[in-house]
């Protein structure tokens, strides 16, 4: 019975995303695509999808071995591929990356997929200001730095910026997630502003409010392991469809119904939560 319920939940709440391979090849073949968080999970799935249609890749992540393997795979498919292993939280390394990106012949797409998730209550983080520094540096500052660096190139090509956010940011703040949600919401707002300001330049900005995706990072939380989730490849398809379309954002259909309701009942939920911890 439980398996049947899970299968039904996957079917209803995580419908299989489809992407037109012909359209994908038309839009991405020969284009330069920058992907952060490219060594694993969604970023790696995105890179594999794009190399199969002939895109040129600039891959950024911390894991050098995995990045090099992806670059070798792309080059074996006659794609140009560059890998850059660094920590985007390191400001000097980020500055160096930005300088190198300025040397690219062109940039057509920037997929900002690198991210860090921390679940810790604020009272337990009084000696851990670095939790907030790390999430803001990676989830917010690195996105802004790369986008500002590549804006001139994106203007020349009519390029697109796609940011991987979380559907949880559409709901009332949840206890334990202050560092993560604050950093993701900051980037959501920045992208909304950039979308308004950059559209006259011909540059598209998109935000993907993804639901749970089965990756190494998300599955580190034992509470998520038995829940329905998209695969990394499913999430990559969602990002690609968003990049090829005209919508500012993607969000699951069910969040359009449940998020407004959650905000209505948020005061009541907070009340009972506060009572439960007294």
Give residue ranges: language-model regions.
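Non-catalytic terminal and boundary segments that flank Rossmann-like NAD(P)-dependent oxidoreductase
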Residues: 1-32, 273-278
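Conserved glycine-rich cofactor-binding loop
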Residues: 32, 39-40
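Conserved glycine-rich Rossmann-like NAD(P)H-binding loop of the short-chain dehydrogenase/reductase
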Residues: 53-70
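Conserved mid-core segment of classical short-chain dehydrogenase/reductases
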Residues: 117-133, 176
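Active-site helix of classical SDR
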Residues: 147, 183
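C-terminal helical subdomain
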Residues: 207, 223-259
């Amino acid at each position: 019975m439980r398996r049947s319920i899970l299968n039904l939940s996957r079917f209803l709440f995580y419908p299989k995303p489809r992407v037109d391979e012909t359209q994908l090849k038309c839009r991405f073949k020969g284009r330069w695509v920058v992907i952060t968080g490219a060594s694993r999970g969604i970023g790696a799935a995105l890179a594999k999808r794009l190399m199969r249609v002939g895109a040129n890749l600039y891959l950024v992540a911390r894991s050098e071995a995995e990045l090099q393997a992806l670059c070798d795979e792309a080059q074996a498919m006659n794609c140009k591929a560059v890998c850059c292993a660094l920590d985007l939280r390191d400001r000097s390394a980020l500055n160096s990356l930005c300088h190198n990106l300025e040397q690219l012949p062109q940039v057509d797409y920037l997929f900002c997929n690198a991210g860090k998730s921390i679940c810790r209550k604020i009272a337990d983080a009084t000696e851990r200001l670095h939790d907030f520094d790390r999430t803001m540096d990676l989830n917010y500052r690195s996105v802004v730095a790369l986008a500002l660096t590549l804006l001139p190139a994106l203007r020349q090509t009519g390029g697109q910026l796609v940011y991987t956010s979380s559907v949880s940011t559409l709901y009332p703040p949840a206890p334990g997630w202050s560092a993560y949600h604050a950093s993701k919401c900051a980037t959501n707002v920045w992208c909304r502003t950039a979308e308004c300001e950059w559209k006259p330049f011909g540059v598209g900005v998109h935000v993907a409010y993804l639901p749970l995706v089965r990756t190494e990072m998300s599955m580190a939380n034992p509470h998520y392991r038995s829940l329905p989730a998209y695969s990394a490849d499913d999430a990559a398809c969602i990002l690609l469809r968003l990049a090829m379309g005209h919508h500012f954002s993607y969000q699951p259909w069910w969040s359009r119904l449940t998020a407004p309701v959650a905000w209505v009942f948020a005061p009541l939920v907070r009340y009972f939560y506060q009572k439960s911890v007294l």
